[in-house]
Amino acid sequence: MGEASYQPIDAPPVHLIEARATTDLDQNYQPVRTPLAPDGSTVVLSTASFVLKFDRFLLPGSVSGAVGPESLCVSGDLAKQVRTYADCVNPIPLAPTYNPVQREVIFRQVEGMPGLVPGTRYALTVLGPVDDAAPSGIRAFDGAPLAESQRIEFTVAATNPPQAMPERQPSGDFYCQQDLECIGRTPDCQGDAPKDPTCFPCVKGAAKLLNACAGCHSDANAAAGLNLAVAALDPTVQQFRYNRVEPLYETAIGHAAHQTQMGERAHVGEKTPERFGRAMPLIDPGNPGNSYLLYKIIVGQIAVDPSLPADQAERLREEIERLRAAFVMGLPMPPPAYPASFWFHPQASADQEVTMYVDGMDILTAWILDGAEPRDCSVPLPP
């Protein structure tokens, strides 16, 4: 392992596992994304977004809003061979967001800019860096580049479903998100004046996931200086409420993880460190790929999809070991001796709770991407 600016890179190159695009809408009018067929037969909506899934964790800076668009060329010029983004003729403007849990980058079309034209054929080309020093192009977190450019053609449908709208980055109350099915089966959460107006048992957003870690990260036991106890007992009704935001602001949001503090001023969380992993914030608002808390969960078993084929699962375990060797130190979250209180993927047992998802992204990652703003869940959002 290494970094291009310091030493030769001794790590596997990045491979594209699949590229997906919006081909339909589900019953709730949300995007349905299917893999682009290598033979170019896929037909996508003109409002489509594109999801690229890789076999390695990426360097967030290479897929950031600043240079990330240059990692993908979508062009109607089928004759031009695209080796670098400079070769991309009349590219469709795209905005990337990175999901480290899934090792995916989603590229959405930029509103107000020229988009996909109905009935037109396009070529999608995934690009690596042009050289070792290039800031753009797909790279792994340790600097290893994309193994080779990948090109797939597709056609845009002549018409869209009438409900199709430009796809936007998800936003909402992901911190206090409630599970509607849970509300429907919880008597105290129903009616105009429920006994529990905050419906504590049905809050399934980021607040619940963070508080699940309070066994090791609380007021009395803030392991590594991190306090995630965001729930407290309301003595007036003898019920818990997710109403504490101070622990996150004081110990997590924008604060460098203790295990990444190296060098001068390393206690200050860095958004664009010269060396990835140095002084990484526990939670970096808007940037899940630079949020150490997610990586501490990723290196544990709760983030591994049990439905993966054996060979893919083994490669993922090897990649997780590379993360741990590079910068994710200490025990994972939760430690092996503790039972998991939530999962990022469905598990074998039906009683194991899976976190909510938003547009293909777990709600903790979605909350960080949306700005990582905690709030008092015991009061409703202002209209």
Whereabouts are the PLM-identified features?
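Aromatic- and Gly/Pro-enriched helix-to-coil junctions and flexible linker segments
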Residues: 1-30, 40, 47-48, 125-128, ...
